[in-house]
């Protein structure tokens, strides 16, 4: 499973100019081995999940200020491989990954998802019923050059905070499942979003207002399709086929403007920001 190590997170404005750099190396006292998923903080800063240690890893939540400077750290009362992470507005954290015995090479591990308090205490463990077609979906996982990769077999693949204070969390499955999870760890709602075409599988999603925008990839025709659905019911409202290459990474969605934002590397490894309007 390919994951980044200690690369920074860059915040850019609507013109693509860098406004802040969130670098986990700034927390040098933690001797981090890797830093992975990140989530916006309610104060304009950023949370990022990070790890140090080998056989007994220590899982930290790094808190950056809005200007990118290090603010604080939280040590989670847990030891597992984290792949999905998101922060609630009130300070609790949703963390999902795999627990395994690292001393046993044959241990494939088990899924583990929990909500932790702002001071690192485990508040609730969550369990999810495996979707009927999740194994098939994992076998046909879309290849998007690592830009929108969802790890096979995990409970959860992507998460964003809603205006209601709950997290909206996507599962890599067919049909797509989106869970609405409260700060206490209660699963408030489960929505199904149908794939736009046979063989199309989810690669990313974003939440804006009362709309979900999900990006699907079809290996057969190498095409991306974006589906907009109702964030309360999962009902499909519209779908948009991508006849040209908008970029592999679906970065943002604005329901009010009807604008989808994609990222890709251009010439000289410069980041290109591409915006597409719904038509």
What label would you give each PLM region?
Residues 247-279:
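Blade-level signature of beta-propeller repeat domains, shared across WD40, Kelch, NHL, RCC1
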Residues 1-4, 43-51, 92-104, 165-171, ...:
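Short beta-strand elements that form the blades of beta-propeller/WD-repeat-like
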Residues 16, 44, 68, 91, ...:
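Structural signal for glycine-centered tight turns and loop->strand junctions in beta-sheet-rich domains
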Residues 29-40, 78-89, 132-140, 149-162, ...:
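Repeated scaffold domains used in trafficking and secretory/extracellular systems
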Residues 13-17, 64-69, 117-121, 182-186, ...:
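Short loop/turn segments that connect beta-strands within beta-propeller blades
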Residues 18-29, 70-76, 122-127, 141-149, ...:
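A short beta-strand motif characteristic of beta-propeller blades
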Residues 196-228:
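Loop/turn-rich, solvent-exposed surfaces of beta-rich toroidal or solenoidal domains
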Residues 5-9, 55-62, 102-113, 175-179, ...:
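Structural motif
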